[in-house]
Amino acid sequence: MSEIKLGDQWFIIVSDPQKQRGDKSSSGSYVTYQISSKPATEGDKRSGEDDITVVHRRYSDFVLLYQILANDYPACIVPPLPDKKVLNYLDRFSQSFTQKRCHSLQNFLQRLAQHPVLSQSKILHTFLVSSDWDAYQKSLAETVGNLSNKEELTETIMNAFKSVHSQSDEFVEIKEKSGKLDHNVSKIDKLFHRVVKKQEAIAEDYGKLGLSLRELQELVTTGDDRNSEVGNLGTKIKTFNEGMAQLSYSLRDLSRYIDYEYIIDLRDMEDYIDSMKQLIKLKDQKQIDYEELSDYLTRSINEKNNLISGYGSGSNFFKSKLEEFTGINQEAARREKISKLESKVQALTTEVENAKKVADAFEKEALKEVEIFEQIKTRELKRSLTTLADHHIEFYQKMVNTWSKIEESL
């Protein structure tokens, strides 16, 4: 596959989720997210702070953006959005829920900004910079309507239990790799979920130990002679307890990063892989359409040839006998059937040619999209793992510095 350059025209940060009260015409409260974006200058240099544009969008705005892009670019892998509701959270306005969604929405926009086609869309540019988004959204309401394609949905259901007869080696390999990647990312997700729970439990235990040490410190410093060895012991206990408190706080910070960002990155990657699989399924549907039309054309040609040669199927034999009893001219009826079949074959030939062109074109675009997905995936995993390593290095470096000072003072 040819090298495709990712888009690097936008730097985007989603932050500061805020609960807002709905007006009288709206239903209930909602959360807005601050989107800070700026265009990248030539030579991969960041533009100045004056070029930063700040807008506020709610989740339904993201949904509209996704729907329009999915409708306008059916051959592209449009990154998925996080689910509107998550069963784990009863309160969708809680800090934990909104902060995690905030990071996930940032991943969504960054993927769009990296896509060489989607990043050029007018709707994305308007979404990122327009201060009059509400008016723009209302103008779209009448034209957009329900963006779901009913014909495509019906086609998907009809082809759900069918498979492609001749799958290219490239797509066989793509399906195998995506399946393995999905499995591995899911395993890592579950593993780090357990890590977070374990670290939170350890941090809580360190906190309890700190309380016990504080009580012990108070006990040993209640004597009359504050300058005695017992008083010295109290000072050392206090110093040691400060180190334990620092360890507990730092461990909680590390767990918070893993829970709020790294695990979210993993789950977003799982959803992104699923979107890629959906595009491959759509490609397969185009291939199935072509194969079924080809089979139908072959059957029609065979039926026409059988009539020309004077042979027919068993059902045609009984039908011709019935027509003979009713006084229908067999030869005239045969010629009429042949004529209809010739017209049918001619129309089907055109349909098969068109279906072949559509299937080939969609396959070509799907291969490009898979390459784009691979590049974005590689970049994301590299960034995510690097940041994870940096947080662990920072944690252990802080612990080395803290306990080195404590050791000296003890």
Curated annotation (Swiss-Prot):
Residues 11-135 form the PX domain. GO terms for cellular component: cytoplasmic side of endosome membrane; cytosol; early endosome; perinuclear region of cytoplasm; phagophore assembly site; phagophore assembly site membrane. Disulfide bonds: none annotated. Transmembrane segments: none annotated. It is found in: Cytoplasm, Cytosol; Preautophagosomal structure membrane; Endosome membrane. Its main location: cytoplasm. A 1,2-diacyl-sn-glycero-3-phospho-(1D-myo-inositol-3-phosphate) binds at R58, S60, K84, R101. It is a peripheral membrane protein. It comes from the Eukaryota. Keywords: Autophagy, Coiled coil, Cytoplasm, Endosome, Lipid-binding, Membrane, Protein transport, Transport. One of its GO terms (molecular function) is phosphatidylinositol-3-phosphate binding. GO terms for biological process: cytoplasm to vacuole targeting by the Cvt pathway; early endosome to Golgi transport; endocytic recycling; glycophagy; mitophagy; piecemeal microautophagy of the nucleus; protein localization to endosome; protein transport. Residues 329-368 form a coiled coil. Sorting nexin, involved in the separation or division of vacuoles throughout the entire life cycle of the cells. Involved in retrieval of late-Golgi SNAREs from post-Golgi endosomes to the trans-Golgi network, for cytoplasm to vacuole transport (Cvt), and autophagy of large cargos including mitophagy, pexophagy and glycophagy. Belongs to the sorting nexin family. The PX domain binds phosphatidylinositol 3-phosphate which is necessary for peripheral membrane localization to the perivacuolar punctate structures. This is Sorting nexin-4. The lineage of its organism: Eukaryota, Fungi, Dikarya, Ascomycota, Saccharomycotina.
